[in-house]
């Protein structure tokens, strides 16, 4: 029965598919919101109303893309589908908890959309800073609904994290050490540890905000001895690891895609890749105040956060050059996933360079809350995380579905998307350097040219999204069935055919390990 299969599923493949469909749907909602933003900013003057409605759209766009698109697709979708297959486990460690992790997300999204729909909406930005998020500036239920939405999404992520950590550590064949698992599995492990350590801090912060709003506490109100800066510290202690949570599974997917289409049996520098991910995970927790250079910290505090932030570039550079070394000397197959992966490597590096610029606290005083910051994080998210998702999706789509995507169309779609996102976000560097601030619905005429260019870019990206939907629809034609699988022995997830049977590894996998002595 379909209801039993999809609503009460305990199968990692079905739950992974649910996550992918949910993420695709949320991604379209988030894209629609982003187009409203770019329509408002396409020329000087007002289109939609006042700054409140504009900021509600901006806030909803951020939350939808982060919590309901990137995380469900990368961790819930690819993680659920691939981790058990890659380590030879019959399923996840806690299959019913896995189901609950997914089904907490639709109500969470519903609460978020409700928060935008009631009263005046939550026009706080995704950071939800008090006093703007307090009950004076935001009277009504909007911010409270957004807080509850975050609580549900957070519980979902914590449960999923416990599940993945347990699965990856305990459900490998005994003969396999952790240092023989694929890099995607490592990336999910590091990501879920980050989630488990950072989300409780966010929960604490927004719970205190909830009581400040409704129970007359003063955690963040100076009138009662509180401090709004405390909220910023708590939020960014979660918020900075969160941005690494969004990109780390992408690192894992890119490692697999680059190795596969370079004709290599493994990525260059496996151990270096693993340690780099662990280093990024650790360093991600000790740089949070670089989001707060403008709150008036001591010069020595700013010096520390500047240098600690720059140190993260080292393990990141290790990964970038290892990907390039994997490509070197390979027998390259120029298929669409590799194009996405190459786009990822280049554009993620550009985003990383603007990040190094922003790490300088003295420069950041000037660039903070300008479009330079928007350009920076959209290069690493809209062209890092999204490109990784596209590379992984097109690469593993035959595994998930048993059907192949049309090669020429996916290549065309890559080209359109590549032009669209770059045209959207590259001009924003110029706007930021010229001093245009974020989160305003209108601007002086001097900024009109690059804003118009940026908005045209967003329409090109929209065309690419619609093309992608058509390509997926077209793939399910009977002519597109997968007939054979290449290289299953170095890519263990393909071992069971396309698509794999409903239950894999019903008896424990037989593993013969060749001992290597380091």
UniProtKB/Swiss-Prot annotation:
Membrane side Mitochondrial matrix: residue ranges: 1-11, 87-94, 171-182, 262-269, 328-335, 401-406, 479-518
GO CC terms: mitochondrial inner membrane; respiratory chain complex IV
The UniProt record lists the keyword RNA-binding: no
EC supergroup of this enzyme: translocase
Reported cofactor(s): heme; Cu cation
Residues exposed to the Mitochondrial intermembrane side: 41-50, 118-140, 213-227, 287-298, 358-370, 434-446
Compartments where located: Mitochondrion inner membrane
Matching InterPro entries: Cyt_c_oxase-like_su1_dom (IPR023616), Cyt_c_oxase-like_su1_sf (IPR036927), Cyt_C_Oxase_1 (IPR000883), Cyt_c_Oxase_su1_BS (IPR023615), Cyt_c_oxase_su1_dom (IPR033944)
Pfam families on file: COX1
Binding note for cofactor: Binds 2 heme A groups non-covalently per subunit.
Binding site for Fe(II)-heme a: 61, 378
Binding site for Mg(2+): 368-369
Any GO BP: mitochondrial electron transport, cytochrome c to oxygen
Function statement: Component of the cytochrome c oxidase, the last enzyme in the mitochondrial electron transport chain which drives oxidative phosphorylation. The respiratory chain contains 3 multisubunit complexes succinate dehydrogenase (complex II, CII), ubiquinol-cytochrome c oxidoreductase (cytochrome b-c1 complex, complex III, CIII) and cytochrome c oxidase (complex IV, CIV), that cooperate to transfer electrons derived from NADH and succinate to molecular oxygen, creating an electrochemical gradient over the inner membrane that drives transmembrane transport and the ATP synthase.
Protein name: Cytochrome c oxidase subunit 1
Source species of the chain: Squalus acanthias (Spiny dogfish)
Gene name of the encoded protein: MT-CO1
């Amino acid at each position: 029965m379909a209801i039993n299969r999809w609503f009460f599923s305990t199968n990692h493949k079905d739950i992974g598919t649910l996550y992918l469909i949910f993420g695709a749907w949320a991604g379209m909602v988030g894209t629609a919101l982003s187009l409203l933003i770019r329509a408002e900013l396409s020329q000087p003057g007002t289109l939609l109303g006042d700054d409140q409605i504009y900021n509600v759209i901006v806030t909803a766009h951020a939350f939808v893309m982060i919590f309901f698109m990137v995380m469900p697709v990368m961790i819930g979708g690819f993680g659920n589908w691939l981790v058990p297959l890659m380590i030879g486990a019959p399923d996840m460690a806690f299959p019913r908890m896995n189901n609950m992790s997914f089904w907490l997300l639709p109500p969470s999204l519903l609460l978020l959309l409700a928060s935008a729909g009631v009263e005046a909406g939550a026009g706080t930005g995704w950071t939800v800073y008090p006093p703007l998020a307090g009950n004076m500036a935001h009277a009504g239920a909007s911010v409270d609904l957004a807080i509850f939405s975050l609580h549900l999404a957070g519980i979902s992520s914590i449960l999923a994290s416990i599940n993945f950590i347990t699965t990856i550590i305990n459900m490998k064949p005994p003969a396999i050490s952790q240092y023989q698992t694929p890099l995607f599995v490592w990336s999910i492990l590091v990501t879920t540890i980050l989630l488990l350590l950072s989300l409780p801090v966010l929960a604490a912060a927004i719970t205190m905000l909830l009581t400040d709003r409704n129970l007359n506490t003063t955690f963040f109100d100076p009138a009662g001895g509180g401090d709004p800066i405390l909220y910023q510290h708590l939020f960014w202690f979660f918020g900075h690891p969160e941005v690494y949570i969004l990109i780390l599974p992408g690192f894992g997917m890119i490692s697999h895609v680059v190795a596969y289409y370079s004709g290599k049996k493994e990525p260059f520098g496996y151990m270096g890749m693993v340690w780099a991910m662990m280093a990024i995970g650790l360093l991600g927790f000790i740089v949070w105040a670089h989001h707060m250079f403008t709150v008036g910290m001591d010069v020595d505090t700013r010096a520390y956060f500047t240098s600690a932030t720059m140190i993260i570039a080292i393990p990141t550079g290790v990964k970038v050059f290892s990907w390039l070394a994997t490509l070197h000397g390979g027998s390259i197959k120029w298929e669409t996933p590799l194009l996405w992966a190459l786009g990822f490597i280049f554009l993620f590096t550009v985003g990383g360079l603007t990040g190094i610029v922003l790490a300088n606290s003295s420069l950041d005083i000037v660039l903070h809350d300008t479009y330079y910051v928007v350009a920076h994080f959209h290069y690493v998210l809209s062209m890092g995380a999204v490109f990784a998702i596209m590379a992984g999706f097109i690469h593993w789509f035959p595994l998930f579905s048993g059907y192949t995507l049309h090669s020429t169309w996916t290549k065309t779609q890559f080209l359109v998307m590549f032009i669209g996102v770059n045209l959207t976000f590259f001009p924003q560097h110029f706007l930021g350097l010229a001093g245009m601030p974020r989160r305003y619905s209108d601007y002086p005429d001097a900024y009109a040219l690059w804003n118009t260019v940026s908005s045209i870019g967003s329409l090109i990206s929209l065309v690419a999204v619609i093309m992608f939907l058509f390509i997926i629809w077209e793939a399910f034609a009977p002519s597109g069935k997968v007939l054979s699988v290449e290289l299953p022995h170095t890519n263990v997830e393909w071992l069971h055919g396309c698509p794999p049977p409903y239950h894999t590894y019903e008896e424990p996998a037989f593993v013969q390990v060749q001992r290597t002595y380091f």
